[in-house]
């Protein structure tokens, strides 16, 4: 079993070096924004990216790290859940931002997005979390993902800082955002 674990770890080292090469190639092409979310890859993608970045930490200054939060999936990460839920409480937003920072191995996120609008969304809770994360220097800018213009404006009215962006899903199979 010990040998199997050693081989597994050696394999992960190879994967992390390959991921680092990919990050460097992308940066060489002039692509500097890396868009993550706490839930991607069953909560593993940020940690893998962070492990690769730790091999060459000076690359951090050449990139913008983006993460999203607010969706809790029914996975091993949240064994208490039977269905996907949204959580935009002050505590959860801060907890997930801090988890992303830890997983990515950085002291700040350049941009934090709310992943999708929740049915029982409380903009005051979000504003409180954004204020705390901004004042602590943990997050430089904030935005949303897949909000309508009215929803964007509603949240903006509670904030003392401008929302930086509304990242919307658009593809051949998803054209709804062109309609509003």
Regions found by a protein language model. Name each.
Residues 117-180:
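Beta/alpha (TIM)-barrel catalytic core signal, keyed to glycine-rich beta->alpha loops juxtaposed to Asp/Glu
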Residues 27-28, 52-64, 101-105, 134, ...:
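Acidic (Asp/Glu)-rich catalytic clusters
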Residues 1-67:
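N-terminal binding-site loop/beta-alpha segment at the start of enzyme catalytic domains
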Residues 11-26, 86-105, 125, 150-154:
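Short, acidic/polar
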Residues 32-33, 62-68, 108-111, 139-143, ...:
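Structural preference for beta-strand elements that scaffold enzyme active sites
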């Amino acid at each position: 079993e010990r040998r199997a674990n050693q081989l597994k770890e050696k394999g992960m080292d190879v994967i992390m070096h390959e991921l680092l090469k990919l990050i460097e190639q992308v940066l060489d092409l002039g692509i500097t924004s890396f868009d993550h979310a706490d839930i991607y890859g069953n909560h593993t993608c940020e940690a893998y990216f962070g492990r690769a970045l730790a091999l060459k930490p000076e690359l951090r200054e050449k990139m913008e790290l983006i993460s999203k939060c607010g969706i809790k999936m029914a996975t091993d990460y949240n064994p208490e859940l039977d269905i996907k839920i949204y959580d935009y409480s002050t505590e959860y937003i801060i907890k997930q931002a801090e988890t992303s920072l830890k997983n990515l191995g950085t002291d700040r996120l350049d941009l934090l997005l709310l992943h999708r609008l929740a049915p029982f969304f409380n903009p005051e809770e979000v504003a409180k979390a954004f204020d705390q994360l901004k004042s602590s220097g943990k997050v430089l800018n904030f935005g949303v993902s897949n909000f309508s213009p009215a929803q964007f404006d509603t949240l903006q009215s509670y904030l003392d800082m401008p929302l930086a962006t509304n990242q919307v899903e658009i593809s051949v199979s998803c054209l709804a955002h062109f309609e509003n």
